[in-house]
Amino acid sequence: MPYNVSFISLGCAKNQVNCEQMMATVQHAGHNIVLSPEGADVAVVNTCGFLASACEEAIDNILEMAELKKEGKLKKIIVTGCMAQRYKDDVLHELPEVDAVLGTGSYGEIARAVDEVMAPGGLRPCYMGDIQNCVQGGARILSTPSWYAYLRIAEGCDNCCAYCVIPRLRGRYRSRPMNELLDEASELASAGVKELIVIAQDITRYGTDLNGEHQLAALLRELCKLDFHWIRLHYLYPDDITDELIDTIAQEKKIVPYLDIPIQHCNDDILKAMNRRDTKESIRKVFRELRERIPGLVLRTSIIAGLPGEGEKEFEELCDFLREEKIERAGVFPFSPEEGTKAATMEHVPMEEAQRRTELLVDVQSDIIDEYNESVLGDVREVLCEGWSEEAQSFVGRSYAESVDIDGKIYFSAERDIMAGEFVNVCLTGTMDGELTGEAVE
């Protein structure tokens, strides 16, 4: 019997890809995918468990589904993803409203779980397969707008940073075979996807587990032969960026000059304690070389404030580093001591102080963004229109310098209707609350 199944995906784009795969699996099994959990037979909450705050968000969503269930507007709740993997016992014992739990190694069991929770008899299955066998490829039902899609090229992580739980939740690093990736990318291009966003926990390591060699540059050259307009890269580790990769990014016009390179900190002692392989000088050298060889490059990074070992001196060093390097985009987060990590056992500043430092870093970054925005006024940029903003009463979109969800937008006027998913040239004329404004030019 077909059931109506609704999916809620939380957390990162990699998790979103897992959700798209589960939707395809459920649909292939004969069930219906519905947008709203209200009135559905089953709601699947695909959780993030990277940070305590992400787990709190997941629990809030589960409790919302539990309320629908209590009101008779939903029949069953299935919890999947990283929080399910990390805290399966807590989910089962503390959330009796949950009818099934699937870990990150068991996404392929989702259709079976739907059938089991809906069957008479009150089964409450818990699937915890080997995380090294997490399904990577296969059919997807895209949940993104038609003009962009993600291509996840690897699963897991071998970096083992002292503050991070990802290897415990996703396993060791596993690259997907290149021919499989090219087949999937070809299907996305044929479906009309214009911006391909290449993702993994660390894309620079791609291929090293297959034959011992870095293969990201070779993969990108093949992807550039397909009918995409933009190819965007998330997340690169600075110590694995090769000369071949830099040359490929610089030479291939479809690869946008926008690189997301998480550094987390710049102090050498902190980097070493956190099991990062970089130093402040090695990071500087990579950034300098990238800017010299890739015209118009926009850099994005991630910063953690309040890491173990960070006193006022180290914090000021971090602020100065951001000012000196003028990194155009940065996500700043307070240190969260995660259970089971080495960093959680180390002495660190109180959460209130980590939050204060986070806010100060955000202020530093805001000044850098304002300076960058002022520097590009008068430029004409190719912008991917994403629709009309009623609030701003203008069209809204992104140039190569703005990635999906995490960066600002460009608000622009035009003398004709611009369709969502259409590229248009925009002259940048002003700024608005840290974002750019402009006028379409034909």
Where in the sequence are the language-model features?
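Short, hinge-like loop/turn segments at secondary-structure boundaries
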Residues: 95-96, 117-120, 214-216, 249-251, ...
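Terminal RNA-binding accessory module
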Residues: 337, 345-442
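Conserved, mostly hydrophobic/aromatic
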Residues: 181, 198, 233, 261, ...
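Proteins enriched for Cys/Gly/acidic motifs involved in redox and nucleic-acid/cofactor modification
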Residues: 1-206, 244, 259, 281-292, ...
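Conserved SAM/AdoMet-binding glycine-rich loop
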Residues: 77-79, 86, 190-313, 323
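Structural recognition of alpha->loop->beta junctions
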Residues: 93-109, 217-228, 251-256, 317-329, ...
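Short glycine-enriched, charge-decorated loop/helix-capping segments at active-site entrances
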Residues: 49-50, 170-171, 210-213, 272-278, ...
